[in-house]
Amino acid sequence: MTTLVVHGGAGRWAVSEEKRQAVKRALEDAVREGLAAMLRGGAVDGVVAAVEYMEASGLFNAGYGSVYALDGRVYMDAGIMDGKTGRAGAVAAVEGVKSAVRLARAVMELTDHVILAGEGATLLAKRLGLTAPFYKFYSEEKNRQFSQVLEEARQGKWHFKRVLDFADTVGAVALDKDGNLAAATSTGGVWLKLPGRVGDSPLPGAGFWAENGVGAFSATGVGEVIILSTLSLRARDLLEQTGDIRAAVEKAVEYVTRRFGPDTAGLIGVDARGRFAFSYNTRAMARGWGKPGEVRAEL
């Protein structure tokens, strides 16, 4: 059964009703874009189209909406995995790229590597025509938030769990009509990160995983926690053991909560039969899902 699930990040989502509705519409539209791409191609096309739509929206902490590092610059991470081939591609700490997930796909399909970082990833983006003007990554709203978190840091009030008040990684998982699975995740990281910091989003087994016959997963939350818990691979193993996608994602997030505390992670997953689930230990998680002719989203 053709199925696509997206997330727009786990966290507080304490936003205005106007933004809440805009985010919900963006999630629904991302699912529609992904489903349309899947009908033309397959699962990989679907997750790329869905994530790219969210990157371009500017509403999430990915693509044009990416947050600022400590030096005031924007560095993005993204990763993708093809469940049919077992191949993955990712980019880390890349600047000025219009779609980090498209660049990650290029790494997967056009190179022998899994991850490209920093200047090397940016150079590949230039060669592929995937760069964008730097001004597109800055806005008055983000400038205001940057000033706010800088002041909190000066007062000693800033800590990693606070990133989920502001940050909302995006991701997608899909099962296509041929039974192929794919997963993708994209993010701008966390406010005030040190330049060069890499989170979970470009790391297979942490921020994403896809494997035909088993399932596909995309994570969101505090990157360091997701890396240390190998969240997506943990969910994959639980799914293989239990055969229950809901139990797999819930138990994986429960492990994170026991080990690292609440307000740290969220996860979406789909299995080889098109059954899907999501779990999170935060106040909320933006998510959308659908199949041809049926699309829904919630915050």
From Swiss-Prot:
It catalyses: L-asparagine + H2O = L-aspartate + NH4(+). It holds the Pfam family Asparaginase_2. The keyword Cell inner membrane does not apply. CDD domains: Asparaginase_2_like_2. Displays activity at a broad temperature range and is highly thermostable. Optimum temperature is at or above 100 degrees Celsius. Shows a half-life of more than 150 minutes at 100 degrees Celsius. Substrate binds at residues 197-200, 220-223. GO terms for molecular function: asparaginase activity; peptidase activity. GO terms for biological process: proteolysis. Keywords: Autocatalytic cleavage, Hydrolase, Protease. The record marks 168-169 as: Cleavage. The active site is at residue 169. Optimum pH is 6.5. Autocleaved. Generates the alpha and beta subunits. The N-terminal residue of the beta subunit is thought to be responsible for the nucleophile hydrolase activity. It comes from the Archaea. It is an enzyme of class 3 (hydrolase). InterPro entries: Ntn_hydrolases_N, Peptidase_T2. Catalyzes the hydrolysis of L-asparagine into L-aspartate and ammonia. Also displays D-asparaginase activity, which is about 20% of the L-asparaginase activity. Does not exhibit glutaminase activity. Belongs to the Ntn-hydrolase family. Heterotetramer of two alpha and two beta chains arranged as a dimer of alpha/beta heterodimers. The uncleaved protein forms homodimers. This is Plant-type L-asparaginase. It comes from Pyrobaculum calidifontis (strain DSM 21063 / JCM 11548 / VA1).
